[in-house]
């Protein structure tokens, strides 16, 4: 399995390095965003509302939110994007007709996207620390566990999205809604406590809400495992339900596409 994953990563890396200007422009754009948020955050200096302890340093809250959102959305969209690219290049059939099991296909197709997401998401936190003295505290391992859990949950939704793309030969419209909903209602740009009861209910059904809240509790508030147990258990419940269901749906989508001979259609 590791050999196959490495082969996919090498292939995608070779493709990525052929667009070096895109890499430098993306790094520059992240630095510009971080700098802009720093100057905006100075408007809120001295903000001490007790309900919003995570937002007493708005720059730290924004940077953790954006970094995590970038990573989470990679988990959701990477597999569906990979499936569509393979379809348009006419290589999906050769990939899926090889004796590779479904989990290996899923991991291999998404591996390079996660490598990129890890690098770019880290830049938000790194630039904040290097240039604007943003300090993080708490257990890095605990924050990492929230990152992995939330990414796995969104990867399950991404598997469902990829199943849709494989069967219907088009992008999943629910992906746009999930991305916009996560950005608006998961606490990336403002505290979820500001949402009214209707939008608050939307926030509570979005996995990134619990992931971002857990990571901020750890990195910004310095909370430990006992204090962040509730959002972690919620993410585990999401994962326990979505993982077997998404793998089952993807397996059925692959079998249907093979049976109908539609793997090379797009």
Task: Annotate each language-model stretch with its function.
Residues 1-266:
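Hydrophobic transmembrane alpha-helices and immediately adjacent juxtamembrane helices
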């Amino acid at each position: 399995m590791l050999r196959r994953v490495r082969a996919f990563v090498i292939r995608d890396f070779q493709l990525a390095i052929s667009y070096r200007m895109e890499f430098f422009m993306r790094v520059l754009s992240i630095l510009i965003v971080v700098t802009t948020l720093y100057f905006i955050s100075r408007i809120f200096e001295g903000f001490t509302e007790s309900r919003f302890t995570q937002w007493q340093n708005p720059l730290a809250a924004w940077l953790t939110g954006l970094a995590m959102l970038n990573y989470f959305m990679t988990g959701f969209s990477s597999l569906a994007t990979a499936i569509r690219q393979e379809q348009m290049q006419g290589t999906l059939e050769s990939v899926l007709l090889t004796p590779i099991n479904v989990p290996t296909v899923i991991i291999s197709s998404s591996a390079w996207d996660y490598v990129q997401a890890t690098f770019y998401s880290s830049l938000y936190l790194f630039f904040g620390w290097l240039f604007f003295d943003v300090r993080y505290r708490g257990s890095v391992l605990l924050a990492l566990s929230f990152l992995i859990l939330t990414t796995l949950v969104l990867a399950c939704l991404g598997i469902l999205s990829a199943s849709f793309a494989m069967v219907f030969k088009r992008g999943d419209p629910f992906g746009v809604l999930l991305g916009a909903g996560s950005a608006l209602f998961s606490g990336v740009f403002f505290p979820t406590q500001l949402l009214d009861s209707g939008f608050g209910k939307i926030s509570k059904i979005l996995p990134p809400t619990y992931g971002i809240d857990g990571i901020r509790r750890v990195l910004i508030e310095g909370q430990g495992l006992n204090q962040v147990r509730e959002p972690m258990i919620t993410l585990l419940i999401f994962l326990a339900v979505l993982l077997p269901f998404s793998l089952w749906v993807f397996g059925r989508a692959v079998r249907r596409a093979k049976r109908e001979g539609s793997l090379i259609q797009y």
